């Protein structure tokens, strides 16, 4: 149980899509059913095909959800930030995991077991609806990613990722938008399903053209319009 740290995690969870509309009594009821799990950077949380018996929320740190092709190529499906959940499909259907989850930083997770939480969801239709909305959002995101792989070359796919990172993590500065998230070039390559070397070359092209810059370890988006032109008008980024 996580009741001793309940106050500590309320604000984090209330910032997430699933929990933000909850009444405090509902959130406390969820916390009373949950357990905490500590994971180290690089630790595998679960793998595709593992028995699915829980949904998890990130309290601190960050988690990568992804899969591997038969050739061993990694594809990142989502990056889960504090307050957001993952593994929700297994919570609903109890079937094996459909993807891998790995901590990209030292992280604290809230584990919501299917046996404990599913009856609570069944008794609270509004909360069940919000879980289904999370599932729908992930399906839309996967659909966009698959469409990108089929229709866009590397510059288009990478432009979409950089624009989404700028929207999710960006902070306006005097020069442009600073993207405040720690992602290696290997992480970026996994997001666009290509090699790190190819990503490096494309980033170098954009830096030379003044589209992107670097400030320490952070990427600076200098020319958003140039990337939007590669993505296309009205293109969904999520």
Predicted feature residues:
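A generic structural signal for short hydrophobic patches within well-formed alpha-helices
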Residues: 27, 117-118, 227
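Phosphate-/nucleic-acid-contacting segments
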Residues: 154, 165-238
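Polybasic "coupling" helices that flank or enter modular domains
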Residues: 104-105, 122-196
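Cyclic nucleotide-binding regulatory domains
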Residues: 18, 43-106
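Residues that scaffold the ATP/ADP-binding catalytic core of kinase and kinase-like folds
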Residues: 66, 88-89, 119-120, 161, ...
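Cyclic-nucleotide recognition modules
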Residues: 78-140, 144
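Short aromatic/basic micro-patch
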Residues: 21, 55, 79, 111, ...
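Cyclic nucleotide-binding regulatory module and flanking cytosolic helices
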Residues: 1-41, 90-91
